[in-house]
């Protein structure tokens, strides 16, 4: 029997790779991809057969609910990512209400699988411990005030877990995603090309290749326990070392200056001044960012059989020099 998949966020950075991975994984399947507007994709997905592009809004279930009839698996990747305080209401509507609407429609349509692309932001970092799936935010109100995006993701996770006995629910929590099309590496590369000196925070961060995340989605269709969350990450590395790796890949030279505590306070003061002037750049306080964030992928390796296929250097190289 031919399987049918319903995918949201298919035009995004990760979403395009998910659509491609599902298309290659199940050559006979029908893919229904919900988008807000039609546009060309860097992976040229519009040229693929067996894909139905549907226009709709997750905040308006009447625009997509009928398309869930006959769907076996829902892959929910769409989300509004922002750290601007002024976007808090929009984030809640898009990420919490939108996910709730999709979940209710999927239950009503009798869908069997619901794969939710959450985020490592839905965890709580507790250095020097390595972050794992058990580390939920201990103060949800503080999370809501300081990180509405992460709050929206963990709130949706909780609602999904409540129905995990009625429908199979798998939650994936990717770390910082790299690979062809990555804006994170692109920003670093642009700074390297322009600046001879690079101020850099000193914390440990966690990275994974976009193609490895897409493969985790494919595995989650049949592997894993309903209601469980799985961190998807490949490499833990200090940001100074990460930047040195980007320099090496680009064959560039620049002086990296680790930011001191005083430097972090100075930058946060400038950010706060911009917010007061209503010029919010959408950057979180550096003091909130500048904490070690090593993450464990032991659970997804053990239960889904997932292993990263791309090293950090391979991910950076394909981000800086994507294939044409």
Write out the residue ranges for each language-model feature:
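NAD(P)H-binding glycine-rich loop region in Rossmannoid oxidoreductase-like domains
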Residues: 51-97, 105-108
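N-terminal Rossmann NAD(P)H-binding glycine-rich loop of SDR-like oxidoreductase domains
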Residues: 3-25
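Flexible, glycine-rich beta-alpha linker
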Residues: 123-124, 167-188
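Mid/C-terminal beta-alpha module of Rossmann-like enzyme folds, strongest
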Residues: 216-281, 297, 313, 317-320
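Conserved Rossmann-fold NAD(P)-dependent oxidoreductase catalytic core, especially the SDR/UDP-sugar
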Residues: 97-148, 170
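Active-site Tyr-X1-5-Lys
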Residues: 144-170
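Substrate-positioning beta->alpha
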Residues: 185-187, 199-222, 228
